[in-house]
Design a protein with these regions (language model features):
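Secreted, periplasmic, or luminal enzymes acting at the cell surface/secretory milieu
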Residues: 1-80, 86-88, 139, 143-147, ...
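Short, conserved secondary-structure segments in the cores of folded domains
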Residues: 55, 103-105, 133
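Intrinsically disordered, low-complexity Pro/Gly/Ser/Thr-rich segments with frequent PxxP/GP/PP motifs
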Residues: 93-129
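Generic detection of short hydrophobic beta-strand segments and adjacent strand-loop junctions
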Residues: 105-107, 117-121, 156-175
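Short glycine/proline/serine/threonine-rich loop/turn segments at secondary-structure transition edges
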Residues: 125-141
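Short acidic/polar inter-strand loop motif in beta-rich domains
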Residues: 125-129, 149-154
Length: 179
């Protein structure tokens, strides 16, 4: 399975209860290295990813974006894999979140089997919450990570695997979306 929480290395790294800023809270705002990051998990065999792509590299701000990848079970026995899709606004402000889990696809693979997996991201998946509580999608570039874990150095060190980072561009004006 995959972790639904982040494990800090030490309790001293946890923010004070009286500090309500998001800095270092949850995997989305963490600046230090986690002991075990959100989404981390191992399996009894080897899973490989290949051919990651988006169906559209440029789209209107409110359009859906579909990402696809091939997932292969390199083992001699059946496995389940959770394909994780994270999104990050490339020009995010320092107080805005980094990569956020926005899609997941669970796939069952027989020994040696390969399947193509698609995840569709909607406008809300690209949105950010503003200071005044609005929910907006901005034009600009977004990074989409697809793989079996959260993107980042610690995940790589623990699993020996990389995620693929794709870039898509949203064009048009900033748009409000439902929270």
């Amino acid at each position: 399975g995959k972790l639904p929480v982040t494990f800090y290395k030490d309790t001293a790294e946890l923010p004070e209860f009286t500090d309500y800023s998001m800095k270092n809270r949850t995997y989305r705002y963490m600046e230090m290295e986690a002991l075990y990051p959100f989404g981390y998990g191992l399996t009894y065999g080897t899973i490989s990813y290949s051919g990651a792509k988006t169906e559209q590299e440029t789209s209107a701000v409110l359009d859906d974006v579909t990402v696809c990848t091939k997932v292969k079970n390199e083992s001699a026995y059946p496995l389940h894999e959770s394909v994780e899709v994270y999104v990050k606004y490339k020009n995010a402000q320092p107080d805005e979140p980094g990569f956020q889990l926005k899609g997941i696809a669970c796939v069952e693979l027989q020994a040696g089997e390969e399947k193509e997996v698609s995840v569709t991201l909607h406008a809300r998946d690209f949105a950010v919450i503003t200071e005044d509580g609005g929910c907006v999608v901005r034009p600009g570039e977004y990074e989409i990570s697809i793989g079996g874990q959260q993107p980042g150095e610690r995940s790589r060190a623990l699993t020996g695997r990389e995620t693929v980072i794709l870039t898509v561009r949203k064009e048009g004006n900033e748009e409000n979306v439902e929270y």
